Amino acid sequence: KAIYDRLASCGDDDKYQYAMVAYHLYNTLTENGHVARGVCTVDADGHLADIHERTRIEKHGDQAEYTEDDGATWEKLGEDTLVSMNLWGFTSSILKELKARFVPFLEKNLSVNPLKCEYFLPFVVDELLKEGKAEVTVLKSVDRWYGVTYKEDKKMVTDAIQGMKDGGLYPKKLWEE
């Protein structure tokens, strides 16, 4: 609802007006392997300053770390690091930007590594920020993110959803027939 309220209260002006929900990194990690997250820097006004997709973040004990060289070196990330889980609020302007940037992305990246060539949404958002074409309001969440990255994550996620249903946060039947 917060993203809807933000987008409903503004429209694109001299800059595209977008929004995103950011989570604390530690609330998004799995015990079962590495994850990809958009690591965010937020300015004093609560706007996204930049976002860098880190495609291999792992928990090592109580520390979250990422590597960009297949594990040869690791960089620490603070537990309060804000990350994107791709919960974005865009105006329709994002569609033309995604379309315009897709073919150049493929031309640059497809021949290098076709099996790992992924068009990450945060890459486009970061380009728009650097070009001064967009402003992204960051809505911070303190909630835990539940997702199934690995099959071993499924039980934890289903147990968490059941707990939310038992606690009254969700109805007993989420999807009525």
Task: For the regions a language model picked out, list residue spans one by one.
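Conserved core of the sugar-phosphate nucleotidyltransferase
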Residues: 1-87
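Residue-level signal for well-ordered alpha-helical positions
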Residues: 32, 54, 100-101, 160
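Catalytic beta-strand/loop signature of glycosyltransferases that borders the donor
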Residues: 82, 137-143
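Conserved nucleotide-sugar donor-binding
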Residues: 87-99
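A C-terminal functional module that forms or caps the active site or interfaces directly
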Residues: 99-133
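Hydrophobic alpha-helical segments
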Residues: 127-135, 160-167
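Terminal low-complexity segments of carbohydrate-biosynthetic enzymes
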Residues: 155-177
